[in-house]
Amino acid sequence: DVYKRQAEFALIRKIAEMPEMINTAAKDYDPSALTRYSYELAQAFHKFYDSCPIKDADADVKQSRLALCEAARTTLRNVLSLLKVEAPERM
């Protein structure tokens, strides 16, 4: 249970870093900072998805985890858009 919460909070923290990463990348003229961030975000999402079941969770937990998935998807799509990369809708 602690591991699940750690994965959830790690993903939330990574999502929250996005505005700072954009500012840093722009200030330093370093678009590779955004590629690193998108990779780290994908890793955080993978750990979350691997350790936090959604389908079999109770209704409240399921709803919050689905909202976190949507936040990660939106964040990754926005970062990729800044890099002029089109994010796939389905994998």
Locate predicted features.
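Non-catalytic interaction-recognition regions
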Residues: 1-91
